[in-house]
Amino acid sequence: MIKSKKMFAISVFTALALYANAYADETKEKSEKNSLGSVEVLATESQEESYTVASMNTSTKLDLSLRDTPQSVSVFTKQKLDDLGITSYDEMLKRVTGVTLNRWDERLNSSARGFVIDYFKIDGMPSYSSYNARDIDLSMYERVEVVRGANGLTTGAGNPSMSINLVRKRADSKELKGDVSLKAGSWNSYSASADVSSKLNESGSVRGRVVVKHEDADSYMDNYKRTNDIFYGVIDADLTDSTYLSLGAAYQKLDRDGVRWGGLPAFYSDGTRANFDRAKTVSDDWTHWNVTTKSVFANLEQTLYKDIDLNVAYSYDKIDSDTALLYFAGAVNRFDGSGIEYMDWKADEQSEVHNLDVNVDIPFEIGGLSQQIIVGASYNLDKTTKYNGVYPNGYYSTLPNFYAYKTILPLASASDVPYIVEPEEIEQKGIYFTGKFSLLEDLKLITGARVSYWEYTSDNPANETRKFTNEITPYVGLVYDLNENHSVYTSYTSIFQPQDDKDSSGSYLNPIDGKSYEAGIKSEFLGGKINTSLSIFRIEQDNVAQDDPSGVFVPGTTTIASIEAEGVTSKGVELDITGQVTDNFTIDFGISNFEAKDANGDKYDTKASRTTANIFAKYVINNFTIGAGANYKSKYYTGSGLTKITQDAYTIANMMLAYKINKNTNLQLNIDNLFDKEYYEGIGNNSMVYGTPRSAMLTLKYSF
């Protein structure tokens, strides 16, 4: 706690120093004519109170409007995140159309269109390491861009589910601007944050931005507490008329005490469904799951000739995870609480992620029609070292009474825990081409391809080196403008996923091939203030491992060999409506339905709701803003027969009330799970995790 307070104090001092630098020039600026000279800082979407954006590039690296992107896409702008009271990655996932969630503990498993979301991006560069326990704070990001389906062209390896791109905040203001927020909410939740931007020299060619945040919170769950500290700083510089450089660093320290490892027992020993208070968890006061993330990044944009630009981006992330956990197994005797065994566990994990992307953007014209191509190369290195403990107090011990326990014997000290060190790394290289070609005035071809190299290495003798080269990932899309407001599109996109199964000769199987077919109609109204999208899709997986029907073993082992077979097929429909209907009324609506089956025709991943829907609308009346929304999930289940666990369809309602005290100050109340619906946020093998009860958050925000 002392360290976090020191960090926050230093961060606030930095922000104040930035403020002082800008204030020192304020008097002089007022007397001068506001002329940017050769430096031009354009207004961005961050300055608009909008739920939509003019363009995005997550799908292809091309800056395409939402209408010109031949895939189902959506955007969480800063305004939308603020209105919904969303501050973290996990909270945002609950509101993304088509995403289904299954919480295990601090880990949140997410899927879309029937497939696990196994990566995300930051400024277009992929990250795979431990993302599902990091719960990234969104105060460092301007917006979140979502592309549904396969996105291998700009990613490399992954599942054909969804690409989520976090777009960092930039130092895009020549004037002093920013905001300070104070929050207070349920279960002793408090936070303070500041976001300050300013020029750093007289001309404004060098600009800076600092974001700081400190958060403390208890929970509805027994034992659980969390602290969250954020520092983010970025400097943007127009070095010349043709050279732009951005340098930045980010830091997040997320400490969580009293964490669970898995869910509550789902059944009593007599086979009936267990029922516990939502506050009860499988945790102790010494359990913890702490994650510290440190990042540095740089972006260079250089005009080479006329409109031809060179873009170079690099990022480095260091992620340290420290866990001490308690696991429960068994079925509870409903009368005396017996029948449960437990074990403790200590483990650490360190990851380092390097990303480099270099590309050249070449716009040109043919026959008076604009064309654009981008050629580039990318590199990703993900090095992870796992320090796995070996059960400090033995394997399983008997718990006398599950109802009565308050604390288990303390975990052995970290110095006493023997570790098994398991370093491993995944290296990816790729070259890619992407282009937008205007075939006719109203017909555009969006196409590209990527050639990938992927290699896995490990110091663990049980994990052999795997290497796949020349993996080709094509992308083809057509967009036809019916008129000023409507476009139809169709696309074929793909992605690959390496696997570790071997055939009868001892060779690794080829990577799983994920292919996504999509078609739809997109519309925009009121000058782009409202965007709608209706899409249908079909996703197929090929080369999925299946036991060799001959029953032969992999040479030198007792493992059944595998063959490549047809895998899961998913198909469905999605609808999105987002934007500002009038100056006072804004709506955001999305609904998704899919069905996924394996090669035998059986339902695949029954823990994923087949239908999900999200709606939020707000109305401004003078200085008051009223908002309300709901999130719907259809039935999902796991297991069968007597061990089947089912969560029936449910709806979670939310609301927002805001009052604009003056032009600079706003007071906002957000209430989640308004009617205090009890539901399972996660279900697993004989376990269940309750969702969060009704909660409220009050925010006082001062902007300048």
Name each model feature, range by range.
Residues 1-84, 90-97:
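N-terminal Sec signal peptide and the immediately downstream disordered periplasmic leader
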Residues 75-78, 89-95, 101, 108-150:
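Periplasmic plug
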Residues 139-142, 153-231, 239-243, 294, ...:
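Outer-membrane beta-barrel translocator/receptor signature
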Residues 215-219, 232-303, 318-351, 395-420, ...:
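Acidic/polar loop-and-plug regions of large Gram-negative outer-membrane beta-barrel proteins
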Residues 238-240, 351, 370-382, 422-541, ...:
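Structural signature of Gram-negative outer-membrane beta-barrels, strongest in the C-terminal barrel
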Residues 296-319, 342-459:
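Face-selective signature of the C-terminal outer-membrane beta-barrel domain
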Residues 301-303, 309-315, 319-325, 488, ...:
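Membrane-embedded beta-barrel scaffold of Gram-negative outer-membrane proteins
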Residues 440-442, 563-641, 660-666, 675-678, ...:
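Gram-negative outer-membrane beta-barrel transporters
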